[in-house]
Amino acid sequence: MSDSDSKRIDVEAPERVEQHELQVMPVGSTIEVPSLDSTPKLSKRNSSERSLPLRSYSKWSPTEQGATLVWRDLCVYTNVGGSGQRMKRIINNSTGAIQPGTLMALMGSSGSGKTTLMSTLAFRQPAGTVVQGDILINGRRIGPFMHRISGYVYQDDLFLGSLTVLEHLNFMAHLRLDRRVSKEERRLIIKELLERTGLLSAAQTRIGSGDDKKVLSGGERKRLAFAVELLNNPVILFCDEPTTGLDSYSAQQLVATLYELAQKGTTILCTIHQPSSQLFDNFNNVMLLADGRVAFTGSPQHALSFFANHGYYCPEAYNPADFLIGVLATDPGYEQASQRSAQHLCDQFAVSSAAKQRDMLVNLEIHMAQSGNFPFDTEVESFRGVAWYKRFHVVWLRASLTLLRDPTIQWLRFIQKIAMAFIIGACFAGTTEPSQLGVQAVQGALFIMISENTYHPMYSVLNLFPQGFPLFMRETRSGLYSTGQYYAANILALLPGMIIEPLIFVIICYWLTGLRSTFYAFGVTAMCVVLVMNVATACGCFFSTAFNSVPLAMAYLVPLDYIFMITSGIFIQVNSLPVAFWWTQFLSWMLYANEAMTAAQWSGVQNITCFQESADLPCFHTGQDVLDKYSFNESNVYRNLLAMVGLYFGFHLLGYYCLWRRARKL
């Protein structure tokens, strides 16, 4: 065993800590914790030595004294797929610590494991990730509570473009803040965040998308993402490539905001790719990764000194960040040599004095966590989230606003539906009298009404869940709401349109075509058309969640549509269906609706005009003759209505299950 190994304090995980060289400190003791940054800051704003923080371990709380995040011997494996479910190690025995007031840059070449390490430390790793090692924040193992005490700013900004900045922050505040926060307090928090992030003038501006005339700029969208994460005043903030896609001025303003947060005691970890020299100077700590291993941890100035001591000198007037990343990167054509060079630096850092100082801090933090019970646990557990029904209400209200403000989803379809009702009514006007030709016209009008409320509504919702799936996954991982709340809220937001739209359609179409003028016939027809549209939409939602893309969903849905159309009862009698397709009649809402609407039109009709009858072309004399022609039974009307209600809930249950399963896998 080497000297460095023999001097290392071997402290186990908090649940099984053993006492070796450290003396257990009594509760209430104050100890000086060594800082990982013992060098002057490169930024001109702070050229003096940083004072070493003092922590009273009897008052260890996330709000009063910040958060210290430590991890030891951390290995992270991800599933790379294949029949054998092969696991690939992304992070290799990483150890580190971040103290309150630290703005740390996590750097490395592409594929070095930056995002994987940060998402693991934030307890936001993807499903299927295997984590080994110890990760603690203020002496407590990380867990789902990290979503409450930390913020995570993703590289790509996901918003609902139809909402304004103020509306988005309002919705997020309702979902993130403690239920005991009053309306006035919530308003003041949002106003303060708008002022801090420079978004006060854009509060009423819609976030927008690429097709909108007035949208937020890239810098404003990034600041809005920061404002959302700062709502619950996190003690630790994780930022994944926060400057990506921003111009130099916006990037500088953003990093300046991070610097100010760190000065107030927030612990901040950022992955950053090729920052400018000016941006790099704002970070008081840097961690370099190479193929999942730690190549250096410490101040930027010490990083340059460490590399220089091993033969890598940064040229004059050269960006230090580019130099450090370039040394650890893999050069095309020299892959093996580049990897050996990077691994050599990792090996040298592992036995350096900086690594020993880091290990001492990590072991000390883990050991001191066993000195007593700290208020940190109490403060974490005292958080009271929003009640489930309020979460559901917020998600439903947001989905409803999106539908109302998106013309492609609601208003254009509504206008199209009214236009089609007038066209259909005009085509069948005066043709539905009780005669032999009238029978064909009535059945044709009924089928058109069914098909018009089947195909377009069903295909129009195929993009509903795939379009919002990335945002849904991000927010559910943050614990804002559940899969069931999200699915039910979106369906409930669709429901008013799914009732009003077919009702207006059937009112216009029914009276223009001159169908049977009895309350019973109209009522059954209206209920059938409303149910047809809702069942078709439910089927579309099921296929929307069952497949990853709209083209794939359509590829499977189109053949099923043809089967339902053929078995609707107008093209072929149900009794004559082949045995292989006998089951389709139980799933065909078009058949249920056609039978019920036909029965409502012809039951009780005793006289149908027949001008000429022959053996080859017999006439329909009564309404019962029409029902017998299609093998329909007037006693099945209410059964068919209930069957369509059952299909509606059945398709939605399948849709929810598919969405839940997809979310669980990712």
Swiss-Prot record:
Compartments in which it is found: Cytoplasmic vesicle membrane
PANTHER family from the UniProt entry: ABC TRANSPORTER G FAMILY MEMBER 28, PROTEIN SCARLET
Extracellular domain ranges by topology: 439-444, 512-518, 573-639
PROSITE patterns reported for this sequence: ABC_TRANSPORTER_1, ABC_TRANSPORTER_2
Gene3D superfamilies xref list: P-loop containing nucleotide triphosphate hydrolases
GO MF annotations in UniProt: ABC-type transporter activity; amine transmembrane transporter activity; ATP binding; ATP hydrolysis activity; ATPase-coupled transmembrane transporter activity; pigment binding; transmembrane transporter activity
Family: Belongs to the ABC transporter superfamily. ABCG family. Eye pigment precursor importer (TC 3.A.1.204) subfamily.
Name of the featured protein: Protein scarlet
UniProt catalytic activity: L-kynurenine(out) + ATP + H2O = L-kynurenine(in) + ADP + phosphate + H(+)
Tissue expr: Expressed in the eye, specifically in primary pigment cells, secondary pigment cells and retinula cells (at protein level).
Organism this protein belongs to: Drosophila melanogaster
Domain ABC transporter: 69-316
Residues given in the record as ATP binding sites: G108, S109, S110, G111, S112, G113, K114, T115
Membrane topology term: Multi-pass membrane protein
First-tier enzyme category under EC: translocase
Glycosylation, residue list: N607, N633
Enzyme Commission code(s) on record: 7.6.2.-
GO-annotated biological processes: aminergic neurotransmitter loading into synaptic vesicle; eye pigment precursor transport; transmembrane transport
Region (Disordered): 26-55
